[in-house]
């Protein structure tokens, strides 16, 4: 039974989202109960008509018209009540799933950066989109259908016991068999449904990977190989789906129809034990009608069992994201004043990797100084910058900002005072103004001043709508250098105390590099500046250059001091000088 999920705890958590809509839910249930009752009363009227009017040949027109009118009113009432309950349940479902989706999205936004390093993005997207849509079925389809079916079963059984309790006992025999079928279905369907949800997320992940890497795929003619990768996941999803369908086809409708036929045969067998005339024709008609009606909610319940299992499995995946550990930040909300950094005995390794990426790092960076981290690929430069940003929790050692442990500083203070410009900046499909402010309440005049600082004001003025001009998807109407300048402008409007540039000039032309150099010269007076350098020519004026090799500090000093040592930095600088 280990492969079964904790059904009731997950269902209970999902139903909590319906709790704020209690009044609507009660009204919907009243409509549902009234509609089901109206639906069941019809055969009783017909039974009365057969027994008391038709069989006795007392065809009074007024009585017949009254029965017909009542029957039509009951059917119309049933239709309207079922319509209104359906509208209410759908409204509750949409509002509940909207809240659930917001919670899932919030949980995704609160995930530690390390989770995005190890978890496929497609899996997370699937939890926010596909899985929440599967849970929606619980609110707008499964819940109302199950409740309506259960109400119908009880009302039909009550009516059957009222008419003839011997025959009703025979009909009651079907219920334990149905419960057995549902338990067997749950046992075999749960692991299959898990696979279905997983493979669907895998398809999303591989498709996302393919779209993002389309340039490389087409450049190296790898379309067929990536098509095969998606096809493999799609085939696995298809096979798991087919197993579910075969299980549905065997355990649900056909088996229930067979059970109903067996009950009908039992009725016929039961008749042989009663004397002729013991049953009225109207009662017999009502029982046969109710048996057919009883079959419908039972089939509906077993069919919804499949949808319910999908919703529960989707809920399990959603809550695995919501309940996943969040990165812990401190509670100190005092703003940083100087931007002084002190790194003491820091060693670090990523999750699922026992080898240290950084080992025994000790650095002191004074306020408003210009420091550069250099080293070959894999030396630990970006990891060290990410630790200063507070992206990863420290395992060994301490980092102090303004003599306060980074673990004690609140998330809002950390994000406001320590900012980073990455090598591949993110540009949103929105206006230039929004891309800089990101929704923060920043005056337009201040934004223009920052644009002047980063030498982008002329570009923005040349655009049709100026600062409110729309940028294309991922900033496709901007050059790489312009994106970098925009990213620098984005962080400068916040006046950070510590600014980190992670190889921000690695992929740009020399002209844009000079603009960025001018920008850095103008802002270094206001904040502590840390640059992860690819081009060593950009850090010649740094107050201190720290050379990393295999996660260790091997050299530090000014540009001139390191050249004098003629060691690692000297070799790197000479190599680049000869290269250019």
Curated annotation (Swiss-Prot):
Organism of provenance: Buchnera aphidicola subsp. Acyrthosiphon pisum (strain APS) (Acyrthosiphon pisum symbiotic bacterium)
Protein name in UniProt: Multidrug resistance-like ATP-binding protein MdlB
Alphabetized InterPro entries for the sequence: AAA+_ATPase, ABC1_TM_dom, ABC1_TM_sf, ABC_transporter-like_ATP-bd, ABC_transporter-like_CS, P-loop_NTPase, Type_1_exporter
Keyword Mitochondrion assigned: no
Keyword Acyltransferase on entry: no
Catalytic activity, EC: 7.6.2.2
Similarity field: Belongs to the ABC transporter superfamily. Drug exporter-2 (TC 3.A.1.117) family.
Binding residues for ATP: 375-382
Ranges annotated as spanning the membrane: 26-46, 61-81, 150-170, 173-193, 247-267, 268-288
UniProtKB keywords: ATP-binding, Cell membrane, Membrane, Nucleotide-binding, Translocase, Transmembrane, Transmembrane helix, Transport
Reactions it catalyzes: ATP + H2O + xenobioticSide 1 = ADP + phosphate + xenobioticSide 2
Main EC class the enzyme belongs to: translocase
Gene3D superfamilies: ABC transporter type 1, transmembrane domain, P-loop containing nucleotide triphosphate hydrolases
Ranges of residues in domain ABC transporter: 341-575
Main location: membrane
PROSITE patterns: ABC_TM1F (PS50929), ABC_TRANSPORTER_1 (PS00211), ABC_TRANSPORTER_2 (PS50893)
């Amino acid at each position: 039974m280990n492969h079964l999920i904790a059904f009731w705890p997950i269902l209970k958590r999902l139903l909590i989202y319906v709790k704020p809509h209690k009044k609507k839910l009660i009204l919907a249930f009243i409509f549902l109960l009234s509609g089901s009752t109206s639906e069941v009363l019809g055969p009783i009227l017909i039974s009365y008509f057969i027994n008391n009017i038709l069989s006795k040949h007392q065809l009074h027109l007024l009585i017949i018209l009254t029965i017909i009118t009542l029957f039509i009113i009951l059917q119309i009432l049933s239709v309207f009540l079922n319509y209104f309950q359906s509208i209410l349940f759908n409204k509750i479902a949409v509002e509940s799933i909207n809240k659930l989706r917001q919670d899932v999205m919030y949980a995704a936004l609160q995930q530690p950066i390390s989770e995005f390093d190890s978890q496929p993005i497609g899996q997370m997207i699937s939890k926010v989109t596909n899985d929440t849509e599967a849970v929606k079925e619980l609110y707008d389809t499964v819940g109302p259908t199950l409740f309506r079916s259960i109400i119908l079963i009880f009302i039909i059984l009550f009516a059957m016991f009222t008419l003839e309790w011997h025959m009703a006992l025979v009909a009651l025999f079907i219920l334990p068999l149905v419960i057995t079928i549902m338990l067997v279905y749950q046992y075999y369907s749960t692991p299959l449904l898990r696979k279905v949800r997983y493979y669907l997320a895998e398809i999303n992940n591989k498709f996302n990977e393919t779209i993002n890497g389309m340039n490389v795929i087409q450049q190296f003619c790898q379309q067929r190989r990536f098509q095969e990768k998606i096809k493999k996941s799609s085939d696995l999803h298809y096979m798991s789906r087919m197993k579910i369908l075969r299980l549905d086809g065997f355990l649900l409708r056909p088996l229930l129809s067979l059970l109903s036929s067996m009950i009908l045969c039992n009725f016929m067998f039961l008749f042989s034990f009663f004397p002729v005339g013991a049953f009225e024709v109207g009662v017999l008609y009502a029982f046969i009608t109710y048996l057919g009606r009883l079959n419908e909610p039972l089939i509906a319940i077993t069919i919804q069992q499949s949808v319910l299992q999908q919703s529960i499995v989707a809920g399990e995946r959603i809550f695995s994201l919501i309940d996943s550990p969040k990165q812990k930040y401190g509670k100190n909300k005092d703003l940083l004043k100087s931007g002084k950094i002190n790194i003491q005995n820091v060693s670090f390794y990523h999750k699922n990797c026992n080898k240290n990426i950084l080992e025994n790092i000790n650095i002191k960076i004074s306020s408003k100084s210009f420091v550069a981290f250099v080293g070959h690929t894999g030396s630990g430069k970006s990891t060290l910058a990410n630790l200063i940003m507070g992206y990863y929790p420290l395992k060994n050692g301490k980092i102090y900002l303004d003599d306060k442990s980074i673990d004690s500083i609140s998330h809002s203070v950390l994000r406001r005072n320590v900012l980073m410009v990455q090598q591949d900046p993110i540009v949103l499909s929105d206006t230039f103004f929004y891309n800089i402010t990101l929704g923060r309440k920043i005056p337009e005049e201040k934004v223009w001043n920052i644009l002047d600082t980063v030498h982008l004001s002329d570009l923005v003025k040349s655009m049709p709508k100026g600062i409110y001009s729309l940028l294309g998807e991922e900033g496709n109407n901007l050059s790489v250098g312009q994106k970098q300048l925009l990213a620098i402008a984005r962080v400068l409007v916040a006046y950070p105390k510590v600014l980190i540039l992670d190889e921000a000039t690695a992929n740009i032309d020399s002209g844009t590099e000079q603009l960025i150099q001018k920008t850095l010269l103008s802002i270094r007076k206001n904040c502590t500046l840390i640059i992860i350098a690819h081009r060593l020519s950009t850090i010649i004026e740094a107050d201190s250059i720290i050379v990393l090799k295999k996660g260790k500090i091997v050299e530090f000093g000014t540009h001139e001091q390191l050249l004098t040592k003629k060691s690692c930095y000297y070799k790197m600088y000479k190599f680049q000088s000869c290269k250019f």
